[in-house]
From Swiss-Prot:
GO terms for biological process: defense response. It comes from Arabidopsis thaliana (Mouse-ear cress). Pfam families: LRR_14 (PF23598), NB-ARC (PF00931), WH_DRP (PF23559). Keywords: ATP-binding, Coiled coil, Leucine-rich repeat, Nucleotide-binding, Plant defense, Repeat. This is Probable disease resistance protein At5g43730.
Amino acid sequence: MVDWLSLLPWNKIFTAACGCFLSDSNYIHLMESNLDALQKTMEELKNGRDDLLARVSIEEDKGLQRLALVNGWLSRVQIVESEFKDLLEAMSIETGRLCLFGYCSEDCISSYNYGGKVMKNLEEVKELLSKKNFEVVAQKIIPKAEKKHIQTTVGLDTMVGIAWESLIDDEIRTLGLYGMGGIGKTTLLESLNNKFVELESEFDVVIWVVVSKDFQLEGIQDQILGRLRPDKEWERETESKKASLINNNLKRKKFVLLLDDLWSEVDLIKIGVPPPSRENGSKIVFTTRSKEVCKHMKADKQIKVDCLSPDEAWELFRLTVGDIILRSHQDIPALARIVAAKCHGLPLALNVIGKAMVCKETVQEWRHAINVLNSPGHKFPGMEERILPILKFSYDSLKNGEIKLCFLYCSLFPEDFEIEKDKLIEYWICEGYINPNRYEDGGTNQGYDIIGLLVRAHLLIECELTDKVKMHDVIREMALWINSDFGNQQETICVKSGAHVRLIPNDISWEIVRQMSLISTQVEKIACSPNCPNLSTLLLPYNKLVDISVGFFLFMPKLVVLDLSTNWSLIELPEEISNLGSLQYLNLSLTGIKSLPVGLKKLRKLIYLNLEFTNVLESLVGIATTLPNLQVLKLFYSLFCVDDIIMEELQRLKHLKILTATIEDAMILERVQGVDRLASSIRGLCLRNMSAPRVILNSVALGGLQQLGIVSCNISEIEIDWLSKERRDHRSTSSPGFKQLASITVIGLVGPRDLSWLLFAQNLKDIQVQYSPTIEEIINKQKGMSITKVHRDIVVPFGKLESLHLYQLAELTEICWNYQTLPNLRESYVNYCPKLLEDIANFPKLKG
């Protein structure tokens, strides 16, 4: 007979029975009170969940994506709520078993276990309640693909169709597009990119990367991460860490990687790109001039991009020249067909030559063009010999020698390099190419006029969303060819831009070279002492320079332009810089320079000195006597600030035309604005570490201001004084405002609740506001309406604004009451502005 008593779990029974009286948890005794608390807290949790879901729904309607953190919290709530429902179903049975005033139970084991579950569920509900307040619930979705702006194309549709069919073929994972320079490979790739936008394909992300001839792995990584991680928190990471970030991101995605302009094999594994496969469904498409590169990249399919057919070439040429010119004489169409035929179906040549012929209205001009294009060609390494002489016709069509020199100067920059327009014009002025009056406004205007002319001639390309230009690589090759006397004097122009050299190359013909460009070459040390009797231009920015030898500047008597900017590790210059007696342009911005060498005082011809963002520069005392001929002095965000002593120095610079400055004292700011000649020369102003109840900016005195920075300031109120001294007694209602102010950056400003004074800068193109905890509105409605009522020329706030960045503004709730604001916005970045999310919906062009 079975001994049933021996089979009972006496140890558990004993433990449970003791637990009725001895357990610290008091699961049984506190069961009823815990159940009451659980039901109340669960109701509160469900209300919190519903409120959160409502917020999430609003943000998702705006096109934002809920945060993974929010999703995780909601999932946990769902699990806890399910457990709670199970506990409710058993509640009546378990509470009915309680006896001895709730201190014991008829079934101690069951009640003990149930009470433990109630306690656990209650603790989880309380924990979730403590985490229910999310400042931000959703974020901007990275678009699958970003549309490229493409000019009208002819004869490309068939090629796009062929390439697209190849792309959607499961067997083809890597596609190579090859053909000569200027054939339209980039346009073809841009067209494929735009098809991903139009068709909303199943790919998670389409990434565009410009590779170029002298590519750097880290540069490619930065472009990829810039697309995947707009937060930019990866910028200071190492190459290997960036590779890891890219790999971790892309291995979870079905991606398309578009690589433009490969000149050699690129190690995608080293970059961090996982290989495309049938399993992940990803694709890689690249363009190159070389079929060999297609083989090295292991392309599953290669497509040759050919020149246009004669009919297609004529159609593109006709569209470029325009029917008005072609109809101006009955013989011109036939002559135009001959000119078009000389372009050999190359789209770049057809566009460039077509633009050069836009104003040719006589038969004689067209016949002359044919004669020029029939002239004997030359041989060019790496380029079909029939193309560059044809493109040269557009160069020959430029109005005068100065414009031609300006164009050729652009070839000194790396391939695909985006050149700042203002910086380019500054080079041109110091080189003596434009405007004998140097830095008067006319010089800058003339520079912009030349840039516009070169853009319209298709010799320069306008960059999107920036005040920059760049060169097509074939046009750049032509410019380098012309600049070296058609290849006969290649040693006179030394351009190593973009190459990895680390040390100054040994193959430079120092005694012959006229212009040298080592931009972004990773040069770390200059140890040579060359004899350079003809060198006039030396460009060394964007490098890793640490040391320049004592003898390097000893024998450069004709050097006019020296650019050492963006070499953060460069902390001193050799005293022998004093030997550069012809130097007119010296750029030391974004360097670690601590003090200027004594020898600088011998540079009597120096007219341009840039010391912006020199964060350790200690002194400028004596600059008026040292460099009396300065016309441009740039000190924006330099450690060195303007004080009373420097004010006196600056006033003694009789030729000063342009000044950018950093000011920390409100009284100094007031005094500077009171000196007309000084104030009128200010183009950039940085207010830093300034503490004052009120700061006044006079828009008349600072009429030339183009860039304003307010950094780490504690200012209760910023006020605009728009009256000049002469008009102060005749209160006119006409507001001149800051007519030239294009860019404003506000970082770490404490005090004001709004920035309504920005209405006085109606030509703003770029606004950045970050880490400013007291700002609640960009434009306050009451203040804004008051300003526009008095100054009726202020119609639409920020009517010309193209870029708006708002970051870490905890109290910001509104941008502007006028929803017509931001009509021309092209780029926006809004992050960590939790109270602004509802207002974003009022501005269709603004993306959170």
